[in-house]
């Protein structure tokens, strides 16, 4: 479980490249993995111009007329890929006040004989080149480079936990399953449905293996919850990615690495600078890295050295994690990724998979119950 941290660690990626500084980097990474579950990585090997272009073109896409964005709405895709209209997504806590476009890697569609969760694989929907020139080229390039970085970072995570370097990367599978999700959050003054203090996205833990988030602008909206239940801000750091552990990595390590609850809160002060000047909408680019969806929980569990397990702030976290997640990941990993898509994008689910919506609702309710049970045990409620 997350410790009583009061700030989010910032790690310098170049320090991982030098033999003289790598040991200190790995020690900092290990501490962040075990005690916080959230950290920022400064100066990743992704060109700054590419980062800026991806944010700029994402903003241009969201500025398109609504009817133009709806041409590629996700309800047209059984893979859930495409534009998600404002206020149409949800977490267990309710409606999320955001709009987004979900993009996948450039992979072919699989046949109907494959398991239903593999229907998530296939081509993305893209705005036409005239509407947002360069959008597809830049976002595909960013997706490719952040994915390559995430694979390299999985090796660093294994090394920080003193496991063989390929312990985690061999679970990722080929082709790699991932999602890039450019997202826009409007200030409350621009969203009639949202009040000051509404959730851009409600408190949740990512179902992914790892998440790599590029924050645009200097908005102060992202918050992480510590063991005491206090919300700790994640201020944007120029040239840094926000990295957080997903539930999959917590399962894989038996609770040694901690998936931390976080949210995006929409308060007026988060959308203004120090002089009170409006910063406009918040643009972010989360990248979600998954393991091979065909694997089961038994396939992915790894042996973390005992002396690393001993670093967990409260040893009960190890045993609780296995019990807690067995109720969510009781089939293959892909089944649960698919259920998460159904509950996050209910309009898509009702169109393409109406017979599965009841199961998805039951899974979401069970997830929420277990979350509340665990939080009560930790003293959050």
From Swiss-Prot:
Cofactor: Fe(2+)
This protein's UniProt keywords: Dioxygenase, Iron, Metal-binding, Oxidoreductase, Virulence
Enzyme class (EC, first level): oxidoreductase
Pfam family, one: DIOX_N
Function: 2-oxoglutarate-dependent dioxygenase; part of the gene cluster that mediates the biosynthesis of gramillins A and B, bicyclic lipopeptides that induce cell death in maize leaves but not in wheat leaves. The nonribosomal peptide synthetase GRA1 incorporates respectively a glutamic adic (Glu), a leucine (Leu), a serine (Ser), a hydroxyglutamine (HOGln), a 2-amino decanoic acid, and 2 cysteins (CysB and CysA). The biosynthesis of 2-amino decanoic acid incorporated in gramillins could be initiated by a fatty acid synthase composed of the alpha and beta subunits FGSG_00036 and FGSG_11656.
Pathway: Mycotoxin biosynthesis
GO molecular function: dioxygenase activity; metal ion binding
Protein family: Belongs to the iron/ascorbate-dependent oxidoreductase family.
PROSITE patterns membership: FE2OG_OXY (PS51471)
Cofactor binding note of this UniProt entry: Binds 1 Fe(2+) ion per subunit.
EC code: 1.14.-.-
Keyword Iron in record: yes
GO BP term, example: small molecule biosynthetic process
The protein's name: 2-oxoglutarate-dependent dioxygenase FGSG_00048
Presence of the UniProt keyword Oxidoreductase in the record: yes
């Amino acid at each position: 479980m997350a410790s009583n941290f009061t700030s989010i660690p910032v790690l310098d990626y170049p320090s991982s490249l030098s033999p003289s500084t790598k040991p200190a980097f790995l020690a900092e990474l290990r501490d962040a993995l075990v005690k916080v579950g959230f950290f920022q990585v400064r100066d990743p090997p992704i060109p700054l111009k590419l980062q800026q272009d991806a944010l700029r073109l994402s903003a241009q896409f969201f500025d398109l007329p609504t009817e133009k964005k709806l041409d590629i709405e996700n309800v047209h895709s059984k893979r859930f890929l495409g534009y998600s209209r404002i206020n149409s997504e949800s977490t267990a806590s309710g409606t999320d006040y955001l709009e987004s476009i979900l993009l996948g890697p450039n992979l072919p569609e699989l046949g109907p004989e494959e398991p239903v969760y593999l229907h998530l694989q296939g081509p993305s929907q893209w705005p036409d080149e005239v509407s947002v020139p360069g959008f597809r080229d830049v976002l595909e390039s960013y997706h490719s480079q952040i994915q390559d970085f995430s694979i390299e970072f999985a090796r660093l995570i294994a090394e920080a936990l003193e496991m063989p370097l390929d312990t985690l990367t061999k679970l990722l599978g080929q082709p790699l399953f991932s999602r890039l999700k450019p997202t826009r959050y409007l200030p409350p003054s621009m969203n009639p449905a949202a009040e000051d203090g509404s959730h851009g996205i409600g408190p949740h833990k990512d179902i992914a293996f790892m998440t790599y988030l590029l924050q645009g602008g200097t908005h102060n909206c992202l918050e992480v919850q510590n063991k005491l239940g206090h919300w700790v801000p994640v201020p944007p750091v120029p040239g840094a990615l926000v990295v957080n552990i997903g539930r999959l990595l917590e399962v894989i390590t038996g609770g040694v690495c901690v998936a931390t609850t976080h949210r995006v809160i929409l308060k007026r002060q988060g959308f203004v600078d120090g002089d009170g000047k409006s910063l406009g909408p918040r643009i972010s680019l989360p990248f979600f890295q998954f393991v091979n969806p065909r694997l089961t929980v038994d396939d992915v569990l790894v042996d973390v050295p005992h002396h690393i397990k001993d670093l967990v702030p409260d040893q009960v976290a190890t045993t609780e994690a296995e019990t807690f997640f067995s109720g969510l990941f009781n089939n293959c990993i892909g089944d649960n990724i698919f259920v998460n898509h159904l509950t996050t994008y209910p309009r898509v689910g009702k169109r393409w998979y109406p017979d599965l919506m009841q199961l998805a609702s039951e899974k979401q309710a069970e997830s929420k119950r277990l979350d509340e049970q665990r939080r009560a045990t930790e003293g959050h409620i």
